[in-house]
C-alpha cells in the first residue's frame, strides 16, 4: 500500500474519530444546557468556532505522528511534493467534497422548510461537514487504488 | 457512431527501466520530477501521464514517446 493510500485511510479514520467525538460532546452539552431560542445561535457559533481550532490542532498532531510512524515502520520518507497524479486526484476529491457539503446544505435548509426545530439545521450542517471530509478521503483512496 | 469511452494506453516503462541499467522506479521518478508512486501507477497502467510527463519519460530513456507508450487499437 502506497504512502498516499495509507494517508487517505488515516485521514478517514481521524475525521470520523475527531468529528464523531466532538459532535457527541456538543450534542451532550446541548442537551445539558438546553439553550433557548435567544441563546441557540450563540451556542452553535461557539461550538463551531471551537471545533475549527480543535480540528486544526488535531490534524497537525495527526500529520506529525503519522509521518514519524510511517518513516519508522517503512524506513521510507514521505514524498516531499505533490505531482500531477496527486493534483488530479486532489481535484476530484475536492469536487466530491463540495458535492457532499452542498447536498448537506440543501438538506439543512429543507429541515427548516419542513418546520423541524432549529437544532436540526445546525446538526445537519455539522453532519454535512463530516460527509464532505469523508467523501474527500474516500475519493482519494478510491483513485489511488483504482487509478485515474 | 464515434466511440467516446476511455482509450487504453499501454507502456514499456518497466521494460525500458530494465534495459537502462535496471534503473529503479525512484531513479526514474527523480529524473522526470514526479513521486515514485506516480511511476508505480504508470507502470501498472492505472494512470496515463500528461503529454509533458510522457515526453520527459521518453527523454529519460533517450527514446520517443511512441516507443514508451502504445495505444491499444482495440480500444478505439
Regions found by a protein language model. Give the residues of each.
Chain A
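Cytosolic-side membrane-entry/anchor segment at the start of a transmembrane helix
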Residues: 1-31, 138-148
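Hydrophobic residues within the alpha-helical transmembrane core of Major Facilitator Superfamily
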Residues: 20, 61, 103-110, 138
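Membrane-interface helix termini and inter-helical loops of multi-pass transporters
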Residues: 28-41
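Alpha-helical transmembrane segments
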Residues: 42-62, 127-129
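Membrane-water interface of transmembrane alpha-helices
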Residues: 58-76
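Short membrane-interface loop/juxtamembrane segments of multi-pass integral membrane proteins
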Residues: 77-97
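Alpha-helical transmembrane segments and their membrane-interface junctions
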Residues: 98-118
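Alpha-helical transmembrane segments and their immediate juxtamembrane interface regions
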Residues: 121-148
Amino acid at each position: 500500500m502506497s504512502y498516499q493510500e495509507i494517508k487517505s485511510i488515516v485521514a478517514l479514520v481521524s475525521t470520523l474519530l475527531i468529528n464523531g467525538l466532538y459532535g457527541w460532546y456538543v450534542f451532550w452539552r446541548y442537551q445539558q444546557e438546553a439553550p433557548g431560542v435567544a441563546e441557540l445561535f450563540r451556542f452553535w457559533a461557539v461550538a463551531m468556532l471551537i471545533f475549527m481550532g480543535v480540528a486544526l490542532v488535531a490534524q497537525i498532531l495527526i500529520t506529525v505522528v503519522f509521518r514519524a510512524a510511517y518513516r519508522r515502520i517503512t524506513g521510507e520518507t514521505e514524498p516531499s511534493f505533490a505531482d500531477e497524479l496527486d493534483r488530479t486526484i486532489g481535484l476530484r476529491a475536492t469536487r466530491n467534497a463540495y458535492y457532499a457539503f452542498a447536498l448537506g446544505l440543501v438538506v439543512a435548509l429543507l429541515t427548516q422548510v419542513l418546520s423541524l426545530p432549529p437544532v436540526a439545521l445546525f446538526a445537519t450542517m455539522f453532519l454535512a461537514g463530516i460527509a464532505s471530509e469523508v467523501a474527500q478521503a474516500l475519493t482519494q483512496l478510491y483513485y489511488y487504488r483504482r487509478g485515474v | 457512431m464515434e466511440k467516446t469511452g476511455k482509450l487504453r494506453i499501454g507502456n514499456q516503462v518497466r521494460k525500458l527501466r530494465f534495459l537502462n541499467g535496471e534503473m529503479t522506479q525512484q531513479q526514474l521518478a527523480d529524473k522526470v520530477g514526479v513521486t515514485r508512486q506516480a511511476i508505480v501507477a504508470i507502470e501498472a497502467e492505472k494512470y496515463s501521464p500528461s503529454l509533458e510527463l510522457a515526453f520527459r519519460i521518453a527523454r529519460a530513456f533517450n527514446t520517443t514517446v511512441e516507443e514508451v507508450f502504445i495505444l491499444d487499437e482495440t480500444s478505439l
